[in-house]
Amino acid sequence: MKTKFTKKTVLKFFGILFAILLLSVLILFSVVIGRTFTFKVNRELGQWENTSTIYPYLSPEQREKLLDNFKVAVQIPTVSFSESDQNITALQEFDLLLRRVFPKVFSSSLVRHEVVGNYSHLFTVVGADAGLEPYMLLAHIDVVPANEAGGWDAPPFSAQEIDGFIYGRGTIDNKQSVMGILQALEYLLERGYTPRRTFYIGLGHDEEINGEEGAVKIVNLLKSRGVKLLYVLDEGLTIMDGVVDGLNEPAALIGVSEKGQTTVKLSVSTPPGHSSMPPRESSIGILASAVARLEKNRMPNLFGHGPERATFEHLAHKFGWSYRMIMSNLWLFSSLLSSVLEGQPDTNAFVRTTTAVTMFNSGVKINVMPAHAEAFVNFRIHSSQTVQGVLNRIESTVSDKRVKVEFINGFDPLPIGSYEDDTFGYQIIKKSVQDIFPQVTVTPGICVANTDSRHYTQLSPDIYRFAPSWYKPGDSARFHGVNERISIQNYEEIVLFYFQLMQNSDVRNLPTLRS
């Protein structure tokens, strides 16, 4: 017996279906709107134990002195050209500078100073309570080269002051941290400070060339002594202001991990010959096609598989309404946000393993077919991938037996440090930021560059990468580029940040969440 569908039955069916769909849309809309106005993961802790007994204040004389000290540090060209080529004279001069301008640090009975690897420095600041687990602050003395003829507004090692900014190589990478940490400790010791919790300061001299003689040797020394660290703070991310569309306030991004990296060499060898009788495909052409495939077929967008999602969720309540709705509902709008992020080079680096062809070499004469062509490609690896996984994908993308793929070096992404409400290091850094920058929202982030802290993973599970330098539109070109600079006010803020961090780290326990 056949079922007969009347017009009335069909209309009733579609009416019910439409009602169900409408109800589903209304429920979905209600959930989205509700989360938009209530979603907030950046929660506050309750009453802190007061260990900041020395007020973060700088007298006019201290402000003048710290600026003079910083300028001299920038003027010393501690350049790392390569692993076999460093300015040793400058590193020796920098050692003498530290001893001269920080007399309390070098003479205090609370501070033990050691030179490691000839030019790096390890300071142990002994706390009164040996039962409290120590922490460590990192920075690096060396800088990348700077070409004085490259368009600088002031010579790169002049530390010249222009419109309230100090110009020079190392002002934001990373002498502001080197001098800021020691200047803060100097002022605390001058005011009678005795730490409760032991802490270490590690200043590497070869971070820009992988840190094998500096950071690695400091780590090995601490390991030999059985040292375990509660947390580690190194350079890395910054205070971003005006560089994220829709974000109404500045945000301090604390790097809870950093990307891995690997470099591969692609090479092609073919018989040489005269250019008057060229083969159908040259070594250059074959290699160029392989490189083009790598650039065209990018690594997958992995937004949400690393800490980058938490960055936006922690900032959601600081965006304007439309952006806030998206950030508060990434369970629904994740693909939308990820597609927007991959549209710009600076944000694309947060959502995937990046592919950068950095060197291409071939040819010896214009009328000779080259027998060999080679290219080097650098990959910065997303938190959810590995070196081996990237290598496998390179092989499948190149997919040409004539192209030899050779692994040069690399390492996996770093472990993700905790940023939970009960994580000591993250919360101490967060409080210290808010003490000095009350207008700033703190959020976890991913560091796309590499730092000395990657060598410290055996000493602590919680490693953070942050220095409170302001990062504004146009500043990305200053990192390792032309017109590197820092404002005088910002350098003073950096000194006060470390001043507070050292005192805040003396709390025995974190407070509970504010109800």
From Swiss-Prot:
GO biological process per UniProt:
adaptive thermogenesis; amide biosynthetic process; amide catabolic process; amino acid metabolic process; energy homeostasis; fatty acid metabolic process; lipid metabolic process; proteolysis
Give the signal peptide, or none: 1-34
Catalytic reaction equation(s): an N-acyl-L-amino acid + H2O = an L-alpha-amino acid + a carboxylate; an N-acyl-aromatic L-alpha-amino acid + H2O = an aromatic L-alpha-amino acid + a carboxylate; N-(5Z,8Z,11Z,14Z)-eicosatetraenoyl-glycine + H2O = (5Z,8Z,11Z,14Z)-eicosatetraenoate + glycine; N-hexadecanoyl-L-phenylalanine + H2O = hexadecanoate + L-phenylalanine
UniProt-annotated location(s):
Secreted
State which residues carry a glycan (glycosylated). Answer: 50, 87, 118
The cross-references to Gene3D superfamilies, in alphabetical order and at most eight, read:
1.10.150.900, 3.30.70.360, Zn peptidases
**CDD domains listed in its UniProt record:** M20_yscS (cd05674)
Give the family, as the similarity comment puts it: Belongs to the peptidase M20A family.
* Record protein name field: N-fatty-acyl-amino acid synthase/hydrolase PM20D1.1
